[in-house]
Amino acid sequence: SDNAMMAKEAAVLTPEEIKEVENTKKFITREQALEIAKKYVKVEDKYKLEAASLYTDYNGTNASWSFSWNYNNPEKNEYAYISISVDAVTKEVRSISKYDSTTDNASKNGNPEYDMEKSKKAAEKFLSMIAPEKFAQTEYRPDIFQNSNVEKPVSYSFNFVRKVNGISCPGNNLNVTVNAYTGEITNFYSNWMDLEFPKADDLLSIDAAYEALYNNVEFKLKYIIHY
């Protein structure tokens, strides 16, 4: 019948739709992702789940489940939030961000318990727990400007850059922020592309690279306007 024919035609998926269905089969469910998330962030009863979404990242990495919880009490002037994203394929935590005005205000009345070195150890311990394999492939990259003019830093951030074959990979890193008063991890994100890296064989030495640069680029003195 015509109806049967129309139903059959409607059921035919485009190549893009077929690809999307196949991809979706690889993804963990919302409930599975939520269970993983709650292993790494403590969500108290006061929080309300505001958003839960599955999205695809722009840089070609896997899709992620993202969750956000909020707490807001205008009468007490209290505000807090927690957000976390979980890789929908590998089940790894991709990012964490959290803030609680109550804890923040209380801690600032005292003195920081964590200096930079103690905070760095807390960051390294956290990375060893949440992303051990990736952390083992990184190198700490100090920020020379971090809190240089701050008497009592509220937090410290630490950046660990990915290295492959002894070579740094810009844009691939693990970053952690530690509260200097409590030692709590308040921010974490992982930028880590799934790439095949070529072997570092038969590379030019640094001197040969400089020689090639200067031989092929014509340098001239110029007057320029400095903005």
What are these regions (language model features)?
Residues S1-Y227:
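Long, terminal "pre-/pro-" and other extracytoplasmic accessory regions
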